[in-house]
Structure formats: C-alpha cells, structure tokens
Amino acid sequence: MTFRLRREALRTILTSDRCVNPGSVYDAISIRIAEDLGFPLGMFGGSAASLAILGDPDIALITLTELAEQMRRMSRAAVLPVLVDADHGYGNAMNVRRTVQELEAAGAAGLTIEDTSLPQAYGAAKPQLISLDEGVGKVKAALDGRGDSSLVILGRTGAVSITSLDDAIARARVYETCGVDGLFFTGITTRDQLDAIAAATNLPIVLGGAPEEMSDLGYLASRRVRIALQGHAPIAAATQAVYDTLKALRDGVSPKQLKGLPSAELTSRVMREADVKKRLRDFLGLGS
C-alpha cells in the first residue's frame, strides 16, 4: 500500500460515522502485530516514542530526526496507517513546517501539532500553552509544509486541562478556520465537556484519552469522535515482559523454563518469514 493510500485510509476513518480505537505502535514489531490483529490505524505517541527510542519520560527530549527515523522503520515494516504525535513540531512555526515534511517523507498517514509550550520553561511547574497567535502560525506552517494533500494534519490543544474548556473551544474554532483536517483534544474528563466541544465545532474529533465511563464508542461516535486513544499499554506490557524475562534468567531459570515466550508460529509471522523465504528462493536460488 502506497503512502497516499494509507493517508486516504485515515481520511476514510475521519469521514465515517463511527469511532475506532487505534493500536499503540512504536517499532517494527508492534506495528506488524497491530496490523495482523486487524487494527484500522496505528498511533505513534510521543511518550511511547520517547521510551522506545531514548528510554526517557515524555519531556520533549526526542528530536525530529529520531522520531522520523522510527516512523520510517515502521512504514517499511507494515502498511498500517499511522497517526503520529508530532508534539510541538520541535520548535517554532518554521520548525513545524520541516517536521511535516520529514514525517510525510517517512510515511506517516497523519500527524498532530499541539499548542503546549515545549520544552518546559525554567520554573514552570505546570504545563503552559503558547499564545493563540503562535498556535495559528504553527498550524498554518504545518499545512504549508504538506506536499501530499492527502496527509492528515490535526490541530491539537490541551487547553481543557491547562486553561479552560472555553479556551479549548475558542482555540479549536480558530484552528478549524485555518484548514486543519480534524481536532485533537487532551484533558477531557466528562461527557459535558465533550458535548460542549462537539456542539461548538464542526470537524472530526480525536480524543487523546478519557475516563472509562467515556469509552462507549457509540456515544463517542455520536459526538463526532472518530478516533479515541486508549493509552500506550503495549509498550508498558513489553517493558514488564522484558524485565520479568531478564530477572528470571538472572535468578537461574533455564531458558526452556521461561514463561510468556511467543510461539514459533507467532515469531515467524511477525518476522514475515514466509515472505523472506520466498524472496530467498526467487532472488538467491536458496531453499526448495
């Protein structure tokens, strides 16, 4: 599947009348598993990227180059469309434009640009937002940096939890007028908040996490939410699995006695071993 077809698949999700949960992906293995399990979309979150690439918390230490290279690896490994958390665009509006170009070239189906002030300023104990004017400049730069018109660009705001619901709505409405393809909200904790946002805006909504009582996909779809994130449990589970395995080996457990290891069939499938063997036969004359 070409990059453009992946982007069109994401657009189909946004223009549908239903809400989907994306699979949280962060490397070649996780995206292949998500694809094999039938997820319609992958979400490459900033926190998952920071942990997978740097082993660090999500405090804006990762660089654009590192993020784009990881996206490129995933694009090679699978054809699942991926929505990328591009954080603040790694600088000012000009940096945002470059960010869009690099992630587009890496095969992202879509990306989000947020209005949080990053990296965290000296002495700022709580998250802060950039001004609306700066946010507009970043959104416009993102749209200008898009070479493929099918690339999805979402305006993202965390104003609900940082400033106010009214500010979140005001920012979202302005981002809509700039021409973004959808709106990404974090910090929504009640149905009343989502109801107000849905009533005041027009574009498809992406929900960056919400309480369990807001997980009903039917309700979310009725409020124009088309994508609802479920956090990034896969990388957390993988971290625990690696820890448990290494600890067991350190404590003297035999490799054959380890629990939780994948079957040979699953490992072969994730590695796309059948495809590789066919190419070895076709191109190198190896095997029967």
Curated annotation (Swiss-Prot):
Its EC number is 4.1.1.112. Its cofactor is Mg(2+). Substrate binds at residues 47, 156, 232. Binds 1 Mg(2+) ion per subunit. It catalyses: oxaloacetate + H(+) = pyruvate + CO2. One of its GO terms (molecular function) is magnesium ion binding. Keywords: Decarboxylase, Lyase, Magnesium, Metal-binding. One of its GO terms (biological process) is pyruvate biosynthetic process. Mg(2+) binds at residue 85. Belongs to the isocitrate lyase/PEP mutase superfamily. Oxaloacetate decarboxylase family. Homotetramer; dimer of dimers. Catalyzes the decarboxylation of oxaloacetate into pyruvate. Seems to play a role in maintaining cellular concentrations of bicarbonate and pyruvate. PANTHER family: OXALOACETATE DECARBOXYLASE, PHOSPHOENOLPYRUVATE CARBOXYLASE. This is Oxaloacetate decarboxylase. It comes from Bradyrhizobium sp. (strain ORS 278).
